[in-house]
Amino acid sequence: MNKSDSINEITTIIKGIFLAFENHNPDEIEMYMHPDATVWDVFTPHLIRGKHERDKFHADDQEQMQARGPLKLNIEEPEVDIWSDFAIAKYYLHYEYQSPNPTKGSVRITDIFYQVNKAWTIVHHHEGSVPEGVPKIES
């Protein structure tokens, strides 16, 4: 697989994961995750480790998602760097939940991929809120 094909595959995986999220299908998300993968979620204060913790996280995440209201997602084109069988994808995700419990924001995401048997799998997914600048300093 050449570099361009790998970048296209990784980009397709990322878009597929968020489409699965919108469609309430965590099993499809898990198809792309290494069994030992870790997750820093933007709304979760602790590191999520491995498949067992991710299953609980998915259940809780789907519950809060469905309680909020309809969701709109916009993913910016990922920037992907590849080194042999490792890759890092960096991108922005913009989300907006509608009523009855609206909220919106932007998240910067880094995914670390590892190639196993010629297929890319996520070994770490990291989300962080996009800062709005340096906080004001009171004098």
Task: Briefly describe each language-model feature range.
Residues 26-82:
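A solvent-exposed, acidic/Ser-Thr-rich amphipathic alpha-helical stretch
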